Amino acid sequence: MARYLSRADLSRIAGKYIDQYYTRFGISKDAPEPIDPERLASAVLGLNVKMLPLCSDGSVLGLTVFQRCGFTVTLGDGTKLVEIFMPKDVVIDSALAADDCTGCRNFTIAHEAAHQILADLFPNDYGKAVKCRGHIAYRERNGQPSWEEWQANTLAAELLMPTFLVNAEIERAALCLPNGILYKSASDPNYERILEMAARIGVSWSAIRIRLQQMQVINGKPIHCHPLDVIRFGE
């Protein structure tokens, strides 16, 4: 079973690697910049990031490799591809190379990097998990929730959206939600600002929304119908 790690524990772990990333690329927290997960994975963690077709139905977003192994994927036309993966390989499904998949691609890279970070930091705990599941950890689009996957997702979010960076982006975007209410509507200027924040950081709308909720910038779920929409469309 994976070691118990709280959100605060995972935030501290992420902070150490972000510090290394900023030092490596000469970035100051006084003028924070978004974290490129591929650069973090390769330059800081020593991982090999690749893009290959992993499935024909979009169910497997990415995987990371702990021991040398073979991997076979059957494409939609029946073609079988066989790849040999090595330790520290991070493989992202090539369908995520599209421009409109930037958020999902970045989060998947960060998620797989998180698995490697946890395995490096806690080899005894995660070594047992590795033996149970084989040599590969997968990120599935609709995978079953587990403690280890929660940890990888939480660490990935902390790597991509550390509090200091999100706060800087809130200030840059002049985001103002005094009552914590957000309307998921073009009638709410805050919605457009949050979309711009997500694009700058390189994450999806869902990822930034969840992060802002965790930081209590947004209270509850966004409301889909803005009062101005009612006036315009007579709803």
Predicted regions span which residues?
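Active-site hotspot residues in diverse enzymes, especially metal/ion-binding acidic/histidine motifs
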Residues: 1-235
